[in-house]
Each structure stands twice: as C-alpha cells, then as structure tokens.
C-alpha cells in the first residue's frame, strides 16, 4: 500500500527522495472493504520515467492515490504535472499527465502469488516510442519488486515464531488491508462451518 519503497528500490526509474519524505493519508471503508492511501507531492524531482515519457523538464507536482479493494485488486492513480499545476475544481485535468496502474493479486500457494498488472495513460497515445519506453521500464520496475518480494519472503520465513513486527505510521494502509483480509477470512471460515 505504501509506495515509499520507490525512493530506495526504483531510483533511476520512478523513485525520488520526495516519495519517502512526503506523508501519506489513509482512509478505510470497512463496509466496502476498501483502503485508500494518498501521497501528494507539491514540488518533487521528476524521475526519468516521467521526464522521458511526458517531456516535462524540471520539478513536478506528483500525486499517488492508491485504492485497495480486498481481497485482490490494487489501483494506483498517478497524476504528474509541472510544479504548481493543480487540477481545476471542475472539468478535465488537461494540464496534467495521468497514469493508471492495476494489479490483480492472485495467491497460488502459501508461498507463491500471481501478480497480473496493466498500465494505462492519457498522453502520447499514438507515440510508439513512448509506448515501448513505458512498457520496458514498467517491466523493469515490476521485476525489481519481484526480486525484493522474494527476499522479503525469505526474511519472513526465517523469523522466529511470535516475532513482533514493528509498524510505523507509513504502514497504516497495509495494516488496514491486513485487518480487512483477516475479517474476510474469518467470515469465510464461519460460512464454511
């Protein structure tokens, strides 16, 4: 749920210092089983991924709005614009570039998961060079995540029983998602009985 890892894991692609430095806001709709996490960076470095695909030079206003729909749908709405360009109160947000990322996370076993992903954009739609650039770099970023997640899986497996994880404010979205998943599992177990 938290994208601050972009700063450390995806430098040179989508990560910049501002991602980790900017606080998040988290909202939870317990009834709908949805978690919303937002990070709005008003003055951020433009990472190569966006500079090369949008043509923006200099600093940007960058928004990351995540929706997690339990149990398995993750949506990332990214807004990128020249620094200071905010969306209008009404009407289309024509001065910004928008990228939509969808992950459909499907567990296979206790230790393996299928992660189906897709990326859409509202700019340079007819530009094959931009399409190829985004496809190649999105794949690189996802594969960086796969490497990190495999290492994390090994770390979790090596933890002693009753290991107490330390959670901090940046984990509120992930903790809310875990809470909802636990509720859904318990409800399923009740139905199965």
Per-range role (PLM):
Residues 1-193:
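C-terminal catalytic domain of Rieske-type non-heme iron oxygenases
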């Amino acid at each position: 749920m938290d994208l601050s890892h972009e700063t450390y894991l995806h430098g040179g692609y989508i990560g910049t210092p501002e991602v980790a430095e900017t606080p998040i806001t988290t909202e939870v709709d317990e009834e709908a089983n949805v978690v919303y996490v937002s990070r709005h960076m008003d003055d951020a470095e433009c990472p190569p991924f966006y500079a090369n695909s949008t043509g923006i030079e200099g600093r940007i206003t960058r928004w990351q709005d995540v929706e997690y729909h339990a149990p398995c749908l993750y949506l990332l709405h990214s807004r990128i614009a020249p620094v200071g360009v905010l969306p209008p109160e009404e009407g289309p947000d024509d001065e910004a570039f928008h990228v939509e990322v969808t992950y459909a996370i499907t567990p296979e076993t206790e230790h393996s998961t299928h992660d189906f992903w897709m990326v859409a954009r509202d700019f340079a739609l007819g530009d094959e060079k931009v399409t190829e650039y985004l496809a190649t770099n999105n794949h690189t970023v996802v594969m960086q995540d796969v490497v990190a997640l495999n290492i994390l899986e090994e770390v979790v497996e090596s933890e002693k029983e009753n290991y107490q994880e330390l959670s901090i404010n940046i984990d509120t979205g992930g903790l809310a998602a875990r809470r909802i998943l636990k509720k859904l599992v318990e409800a399923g177990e009740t139905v199965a009985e």
